[in-house]
């Protein structure tokens, strides 16, 4: 099939088009899997699955000490400088050893307490110990993905992402039919192993060009540069999952496990279509912003990104809204209380998308204080509003808090980004 010329000449459109195909396939498969999960484990089971996924998200950052965005930035900048790359990966090696040992020991020896915190029972302590054993694979997958994104190798990333997803879904379904909820949780814990194996199969030859494994040293010459990204990652990749875990626990305590499952379901739908933007940011936006130094060029690039992806997202979100009852019936039959949540979640996610485009400037230019301030403000506002609004509005109050959070967030991020350029020009 011939690619239209207007797409061929625009890298962002090419990435968007390929990404759309991969995400569409994932969404279709995910819909089937989600329905099966709902039928087998119910809303309460989905709440527990959400808790483990949040823990996995948290470990992706802790295990590599939050160096992912730093790897993307520095690989994009130094892809032709072997000496700098070796310094980068030696530092990353040190960070990973520290992160893996610290998080692995914590999970293994406090598995009972963590199981109680996440699932309100110590029955899943075996699962926490299994996750502790898998942590090295979580770290390796995160680092190698950073290299792919830094090289903007979007075709290879799409292939790796899709094959990994298909295999992890297959494992999930096999274990679901064999062991029900426990099987699904074990499959989620084991997924990083599959991801690393697929990544090495498709990408090892390229990795060897940029990482000379035998020359890696237990030294950290770029620690100062990467620690800035560690600080930024701490807020988004560690505090965010903790907030999500706490809100689910709060919903279960104040309302019911089913209500916690309802919120988990709406956020699951949201995360599935927001996956579309995540890879675009790290494959295109972050490397692009890293090479832009003037306000004029930045505004021009932001407008190009907005004109390319916002109309696509708006169309997709409108379709999700208008077909929300069908989506609920297909994925979560009988869970009609989800319907009022869609409008708040979708509008909030659209504003979030526009904000995240601008936020990548903080990562590209290592604007640590601006990044941490905006993220902390966003998380604290969301957490406080969720606690307040859940009393009069129930689960809907949490999703309303999500929308209010991102309205404030957009204006704060926009103000800080353009203040940066104004100071630079002065």
Q: Which residues are covered by each model-predicted region?
A:
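Membrane-water interface segments that mark the loop-to-transmembrane alpha-helix transition
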Residues: 14-26, 52, 57, 61-112, ...
